[in-house]
């Protein structure tokens, strides 16, 4: 379970979830009809090695990401989610945003793979160990960012707005923000502070996009935590998830930003999956209940 002030690198705790997601993106890229291709996701997995590389090589047919009940749907989800936020950034850039803020950047490689307009600065905020790993892996592959990239080594539970300003962020200029796969790892109070910080720093003609999710019922959540603990104790190839999230009720993101003058659009994940031609998991599957609680939100400030 999480504790106040806990820390991690790319292979532990919350950091390891970035590897899990990168593996899913790499598996999506292996398809004959990928929704998106992240050319660097596989590099991150192979840099760590072990099961992260083996699953890409088909050596772990029993890996969670290979299961029909969860894994196949999760890979679809990551392909769809990545596509959603890629398209969001393209729209924001076309509308004039030249400052991009990636909160809890993890193994996000958009600074390297999206066609940013001239004059764009991408601010990546995350823990220093995570940023170091990403920079070293990308450098070893000769990757070059396609915009000015600025790393900001900060915990989002600390004073990240000041760190962002200290790195050259201009609150008076349009900006585009993203919180992808982040909110579930924040307690409700931290999410409120995060949204408040975005609202305070984002000027006119700015944009924000987040992945939002409703909490599980307390009994269902407790059962999932115990089930996960038991599987890990028995030596299963299980990556902690439920033990890392904060299952706390927060104001829906679209509602929160809408009440503060933003024009927000919320799209249910399952509706987006259908729109991009990917199957929606049934309610009886392991992935089904999680997907049904998930919403993709984008908002603009005029």
Swiss-Prot record:
GO molecular function, one term: methyltransferase activity
Enzyme Commission number(s) from the entry: 2.1.1.-
UniProt entry tagged with the keyword Protein biosynthesis: no
Superkingdom to which the source organism belongs: Bacteria
Protein's recorded name: Putative S-adenosyl-L-methionine-dependent methyltransferase Rv0281
Native organism: Mycobacterium tuberculosis (strain ATCC 25618 / H37Rv)
Family (UniProt): Belongs to the UPF0677 family.
Annotated function: Exhibits S-adenosyl-L-methionine-dependent methyltransferase activity.
């Amino acid at each position: 379970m999480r504790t106040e002030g806990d820390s991690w690198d790319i292979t532990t705790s919350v950091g390891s979830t970035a590897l899990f997601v990168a593996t899913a993106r790499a598996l999506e890229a292996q398809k004959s009809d990928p929704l998106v291709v992240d050319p660097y996701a596989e590099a991150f997995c192979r840099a760590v090695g072990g099961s992260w590389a083996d699953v890409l090589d088909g050596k772990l047919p029993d890996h969670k990401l290979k299961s029909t009940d969860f894994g196949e749907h999760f890979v679809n989800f990551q392909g769809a989610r990545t596509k959603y936020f890629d398209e969001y950034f393209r729209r924001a850039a076309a509308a004039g945003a030249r400052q991009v803020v990636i909160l809890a950047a993890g193994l996000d490689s958009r600074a390297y793979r999206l066609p940013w307009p001239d004059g764009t600065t991408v601010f990546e905020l995350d823990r220093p160990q995570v940023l170091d790993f990403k920079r070293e892996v990308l450098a070893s592959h000769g990757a070059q960012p396609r915009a000015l990239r600025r790393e900001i080594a900060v915990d989002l539970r600390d004073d990240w707005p000041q760190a962002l300003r200290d790195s050259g962020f201009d609150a008076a200029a349009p900006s585009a923000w993203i919180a992808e796969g982040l909110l579930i790892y924040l307690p409700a109070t931290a999410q409120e502070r995060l949204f408040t910080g975005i609202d305070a720093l984002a000027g006119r003609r700015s944009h924000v996009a987040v992945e939002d999710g409703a909490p599980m019922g307390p009994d269902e959540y407790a059962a999932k935590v115990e089930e996960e603990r038991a599987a890990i104790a028995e030596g299963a190839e299980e990556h902690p998830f439920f033990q890392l999230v904060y299952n706390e009720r927060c104001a829906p993101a679209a509602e929160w930003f809408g009440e503060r003058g933003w024009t927000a659009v919320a799209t249910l994940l399952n509706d987006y999956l259908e729109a991009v031609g990917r199957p929606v998991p049934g309610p009886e599957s392991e992935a089904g209940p999680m997907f049904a609680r998930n919403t993709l939100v984008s908002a603009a400030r005029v």
